[in-house]
Amino acid sequence: MKSGAQTIYNDLLASEAALWESQMIPQSYAVQSTKMTRGAYKYIPSTYLICENDQAAPPQYQEMFAQMASSHVERCYSGHSPMLSQTGMLVGKIVEAVERAVAGSKP
């Protein structure tokens, strides 16, 4: 990836984006072509958080991924890394997903 700061960390302050970009390591292309054999989403309820400001995976692709997994969909206006830019919101979404799963409501 040529610019993680612009693609993955686009909603962080420039100094924070540069820090996280410096920690990036190469990812094998095999993740794009290896057939998945036991996706957890087939056995347990899943939630997909569509990040509307994601520069790495546009929302229309995220919607396709969520649909393929029959996931419950939540949305936020975040870049690709809400765990860094919107931690409070993300924690809330995780708590809601856990509560749905515990209550037994299948998304």
Question: Over which residues does each language-model region extend?
Answer:
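Conserved loop-alpha-helix segment in the C-terminal half of the alpha/beta-hydrolase fold
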Residues: E52-Y77, L84, E96-V98
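Catalytic histidine-centered segment of alpha/beta-hydrolase-like enzymes
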Residues: E74-G92, S105-P107
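Short beta-strand/loop motif that positions the catalytic acidic residue
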Residues: K42, T47-I50
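Mobile cap/lid helix-loop segments that border enzyme active or cofactor-binding sites
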Residues: M1-Y9
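PEST-like low-complexity, intrinsically disordered acidic/proline/serine-rich tracts
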Residues: L13-S15
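Active-site nucleophile elbow and catalytic-triad environment of alpha/beta-hydrolase enzymes
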Residues: E21-A40
